[in-house]
C-alpha cells in the first residue's frame, strides 16, 4: 500500500508533466523555422494562442540577405518598411481536428500573404506549416523545429508600430 507521501509525490509528478504534455499537443511555443529550399534555419518564432486563435511573431532573424536586422521592404500597409523582428507574420489559425487552419501567413521576403495551415508531427517536436493560394495543393510546406526561447539579450526590442492581423487580411491572394 502506498503511503500518503508516495501518493502525494506521484500526484505532484503527474501535475508537473501536464504542461509538457499540453505543449506537445499544441503549436504554442517557440520554433526554429527551416527554409524549405536550403534546409537552413532562418528565424526563431513564437506561436501564441488567444481565445482559440493562433498567432505567430518573429522573435529573431537568424539568416537574412538584408543584414542582421532586416525590414519588410515588400510588405504592404502597416508592415511596409517595418522591422521583421517583432512582426506578427501568422494569424487567424483555429483548430480543426488535428490541424490548425483558416489563417494567414506573411512571407517577409516577398511581402505576400498566403492562406495557412499547421499540423504537429513527431510527437509535437516538429510543425508542418503550409502556405498556399486558393487550394492547399497550390503551395509550399516548411517543417519547423520546436526550440527553446532565445535569451532576452540576444533579441531585438519589438517594433512599436501597430501590426494588427487585420492589416494583412486586406492582402488576401
What are the roles of these predicted feature ranges?
Residues 152-173:
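Compositionally biased, proline/threonine/alanine/serine-rich low-complexity intrinsically disordered stretches
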Residues 1-11:
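Bacterial N-terminal signal peptides that target proteins for export
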Residues 143-151:
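Short beta-strand-to-coil "C-cap" segments at the C-terminal boundary of structured domains/repeats
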Residues 23-31:
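Cleaved targeting-peptide boundary
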Residues 99-143:
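Surface-exposed interaction patches
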Residues 17-19:
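N-terminal signal peptide c-region/cleavage motif recognized by signal peptidases
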Residues 33-116, 173:
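Central antiparallel beta-sheet cores of small beta-barrel/beta-sandwich binding domains
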